[in-house]
C-alpha cells in the first residue's frame, strides 16, 4: 500500500515565513531531527507489518497514521515507540562528525544538540499521546485488562499534563498551546474509551491471538493473553465471549490510529 504524504496549509505558511525571515536553515535542522525520529517509528512499524497509511507534515512535527496501532501486540508496539526515541542518539554522532569536517559551526552544533535533547525529553514525558505516554499505555496493557489499562493511561495523563506544564515549562503562549492540545486530546480520549474498547474487541474477533492463557472473571480482555472467562454457567473462551458480544463478524474495516510528534 503506497503511503500518502499530507502537508497542512499551516505548515506551508510557516515554511514560507521561515524562508522570508531567513530562518529556513534552523527550521531545516529541526525538520531533519523530527524526520529522523519518525523514520525510527516507520522502520519498526514496517518490520512488524503495521500498515502505514499516511505521513502528515505538521508545523510542530510529523505524524504517522498506522492501522490498528493500539490493538496488536503490546511488546511490538513498545519497540516501535522506542525506535523513534532511539534515533535521537544518532544526532550527536552525525552532527559531531559534520562539525569535525567543518560542515557545521560549533555554535550550530550546540544549538542542534540542545534542540535534539529538548525534543527527546518532551517526547518521553509520560503524557498521552506522546511517545512516553504511549509507552506507559503499552506497559499497562501487558499486565492489566484493556479497559483498566486505558482508564489508567488517559486518567493519569490528564492529571499529569497541567502539572507538567506548571513544573517543567515556561508559561509562554506556544507552550500553553501545546499542553492545552495534549489536555484536550486526553479529554476526548477519555470520552471515547468505550468505543476504543469495542474496536479492540472486534479486532480480536477478526484477528485471534496465540498468547498464553489467562483465566479470570472480568468481562474484559487482557491484551497480551488468550482469555478464558469464568462465568456462573462455566468457562467461556475468548472467541465464544467475543462471538456472543458481536455475533458473526465480516471483514473489519480499517480504523487507523495515529501518534503526533
Where are the regions a protein language model picked out?
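Small-residue-rich helix-interface/hinge motifs
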Residues: 19-77, 111-115, 119
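Helix-coil boundary and interhelical linker segments in multi-pass alpha-helical membrane proteins
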Residues: 20-26, 96-114, 166-174
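Membrane interface segments of multi-pass transport proteins and intramembrane proteases
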Residues: 98-107, 137-152
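C-terminal transmembrane module of polytopic alpha-helical membrane proteins
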Residues: 143, 148-261
